[in-house]
Every structure is written in C-alpha cells, then in structure tokens.
From Swiss-Prot:
Family (UniProt): Belongs to the UPF0248 family.
Native species: Pyrobaculum calidifontis (strain DSM 21063 / JCM 11548 / VA1)
HAMAP family for this protein: UPF0248
Protein name: UPF0248 protein Pcal_0252
Any Pfam family matching the protein: MJ1316
Origin superkingdom: Archaea
Length: 77
C-alpha cells in the first residue's frame, strides 16, 4: 500500500481514496491524493480544512484514478 501511495503522489496522478471514518455519514470519507502530505510506514497523513489527519492503511478501502479505474478495492473480499 505504501508503494502505491508513493507512486501516485510522486508521479502527480489524479486519484482518490475512500477510507473508513466513524464520524462520517455512511461510515466512509473520500480524499484526494493531492491532500496527502506524508506517506508513512503504517498510513498516510492528509491535510484537511481543520488541520491534518492520520489515516492508517487498514482503514483505506478503495483507491481509484480520476479516470474511474479502480486500483484497490477491499470491499470485494
């Protein structure tokens, strides 16, 4: 997962990812790869309107390119 996020971030790919968020309607939120400020060993840190938020990799359920191509879908397990 870390390699995927690094590749997307540093190649400038337009992509989005969905992650489990307990406070969100429907239980998930979506963020852009452009929002990622750090790719770590256990997760990513994103910039939000209210600061930064750490998202562990185990909470990420989907990664999708802006074209619609799905790169990762953990919902299908």
């Amino acid at each position: 997962m870390r390699q995927l996020f690094n590749k997307l971030k540093w190649t400038g790919a337009k992509a989005y990812f969905s992650y489990v968020s307990r406070g969100a309607a429907g239980g998930e939120e979506v963020a852009s790869i452009d929002d990622v400020v750090e790719v770590g060993s256990g997760g990513v840190t994103i910039s939000t309107g209210s600061g930064e938020r750490y998202i562990p990799y185990h909470r990420i359920v989907e990664v999708r390119l802006a074209t619609g191509e799905v790169l990762l879908d953990r919902r299908k397990r």
